[in-house]
Regions:
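Extracellular TM2-ECL1-early TM3 structural module of rhodopsin-like
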Residues: 7-20, 45-109, 117
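Helix-to-loop junction signature of class
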Residues: 18, 22, 58-78, 96, ...
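Fourth transmembrane helix
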Residues: 58-62, 69-72, 99-109, 116, ...
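Loop architecture of class A 7-transmembrane GPCRs
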Residues: 1-3, 73-98, 126, 147-196
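First transmembrane helix
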Residues: 10-38, 199-203
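Intracellular effector-coupling site of seven-transmembrane GPCRs
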Residues: 54-55, 170-177, 210-267
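Non-transmembrane, juxtamembrane loop and terminal tail segments
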Residues: 220-239, 325-358
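Seventh transmembrane helix
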Residues: 200-201, 251, 255-262, 268-272, ...
Length: 358
C-alpha cells in the first residue's frame, strides 16, 4: 500500500469520522452515567452498565485527540521536533485500546449475568449482588490498567534519531533491557482478552437465547395450567410483567453484544496477523497496511462505544423514563416525546388497576 493511500485513510478516519463519532459518543455516555447514577445501584445490572458507560467514555476521550497528532501538518512539517505518530501511540492509542478491551470484558460479564437470570432465576440475586458486580467491574479495570502500565514501563518519549527525516526528534524509545519482553506480555494479554471476549460473547449469547426460549415455553405451560393450580389473575399478570421485562433486557444485551462482536472482530484479526507476521506492525515493512487497518478498526470501536444510548432508550423502561424526565421539554418541542409506548407492562398495569377498581 502506498503512503498516499494510507494518508487518505488516516485523514478520513481520524479527521472526519472519529471526531464526529467521538464527540457524539462522549455526550451520550455522560448522559448514560448521569441516568444510571440517578436510577441508583440497587440492581447489579445498573452497576455493570454504569461501569460500561465509564469505560466507553474514557475510550472516546482518547479517540478524539487523535486528530491533534494525525494531520497533514504534524505528519509532514519540517519545523516540528517531535514525531506525531509516536506521540499518538503513547498518549492516545495505548489508553484508547486499553479501555476498548475493558468495554469488551464488561460486556461479557453483563451477558453472563443476564444469562444466569434465566438459568438460575431464584439464585442469581444472591449470587450476583450489586457489591459483587462492582468488585468484578473494578477488577476488570485494574487488569486492563496493569496492561497499560506495562506499555509505559517499556516505552517512553525521548530524543532519538528519526531515520525517515534524518534528524533528531522526540519519539518513542525503549527504556529497559527487557522492554521487548514486557511489550510481548502486553500484546499477549491484549490478544487473549479480546479473543476471550469475542468467544465468550458468542457462547453466552447462544446460552442466553436458549434460556429465553425455555422460559417462554415454561411460562406458556404455567398460563395453561394456572386455573388448575388456583393461581390468581393478578399473580399471572405480575409474572408476565417480570418475564417481559427480563426478555426485553436480554434482547438489549444481545444487540449490544452483536454490535461489539462485529466492530471488534476486525481488530482481533489485526492482532492475530501481527502475531504471525513480524513486519506487520506500527513501524515494520507493512506499516501502511497495519496503520490503515487500525484506523478503520478505531472508527468501528468508537461507533460501538457511542450507540449504546439508542438501545438503552428503546429497551430499558427505567432508563427511558429517567431520560424523558431529564429532557421532557426538548423532546416535546420536537414532537417525539413518547406519551405511550404501548408496552406490555403498561397494558398489564392498566388491567391490574381496572380489576382492583372492580
Amino acid at each position: 500500500m502506498r503512503d498516499s493511500d494510507t494518508d487518505i485513510i488516516l485523514y478520513i478516519s481520524l479527521l472526519g469520522v472519529c471526531p464526529v463519532i467521538g464527540l457524539c459518543g462522549i455526550i451520550a455516555n455522560i448522559i448514560n452515567i448521569i441516568i444510571f447514577i440517578r436510577n441508583g445501584f440497587t440492581e447489579s445490572i445498573n452497576v455493570s452498565l454504569f461501569g460500561l458507560a465509564i469505560s466507553d467514555l474514557l475510550a472516546l476521550l482518547f479517540l478524539v485527540p487523535f486528530a491533534a497528532f494525525i494531520n497533514p501538518y504534524s505528519l509532514y512539517s519540517e519545523d516540528l521536533n517531535w514525531n506525531a505518530m509516536d506521540f499518538a501511540l503513547i498518549l492516545v492509542a495505548f489508553p484508547n485500546s486499553t479501555f476498548n478491551r475493558t468495554t469488551c470484558l464488561i460486556t461479557v460479564f453483563i451477558t453472563v449475568e443476564r444469562c444466569l437470570c434465566f438459568v438460575m432465576p431464584l439464585r442469581v440475586k444472591s449470587l450476583i449482588t450489586p457489591r459483587r458486580s462492582a468488585i468484578i467491574v473494578a477488577a476488570i479495570f485494574a487488569l486492563m490498567t496493569f496492561n497499560l502500565v506495562l506499555a509505559y514501563v517499556a516505552m517512553q518519549l525521548d530524543w532519538r534519531l528519526d531515520p525517515g527525516r534524518n534528524k533528531t526528534m522526540i519519539g518513542t524509545v525503549l527504556t529497559r533491557h527487557d522492554s521487548s519482553e514486557l511489550l510481548n506480555i502486553r500484546n499477549i494479554i491484549s490478544l487473549c482478552s479480546q479473543l476471550f471476549s469475542l468467544l465468550a460473547l458468542v457462547v453466552s449469547n447462544i446460552a442466553l437465547a436458549v434460556a429465553v426460549k425455555k422460559q417462554a415455553k415454561w411460562r406458556a405451560r404455567i398460563v395453561i395450567t394456572a386455573p388448575q393450580q388456583n393461581q390468581t389473575a393478578a399473580s399471572n399478570r405480575t409474572a408476565d410483567s417480570t418475564t417481559y421485562r427480563n426478555r426485553r433486557l436480554a434482547r438489549m444485551i444481545q444487540f449490544l453484544s452483536l454490535i461489539l462482536f462485529v466492530t471488534y472482530f476486525f481488530s482481533s484479526v489485526i492482532y492475530l496477523i501481527s502475531q504471525f507476521v513480524r513486519e506487520f506492525n506500527f513501524y515494520g515493512r507493512y506499516k501502511n497496511e497495519y496503520r490503515s487497518f487500525w484506523m478503520v478498526a478505531l472508527a468501528a470501536q468508537g461507533l460501538n462505544s457511542s450507540v449504546n444510548i439508542v438501545f438503552y432508550y428503546r429497551m430499558n423502561i427505567k432508563y427511558r423514563n429517567r431520560f424523558n424526565k431529564m429532557f421532557r421539554k426538548g423532546i416535546a418541542r420536537i414532537g417525539i416525546f413518547p406519551a405511550d409506548h404501548n408496552t406490555m407492562e403498561n397494558t398489564i398495569v392498566a388491567l391490574s388497576h381496572r380489576d382492583t377498581v372492580r
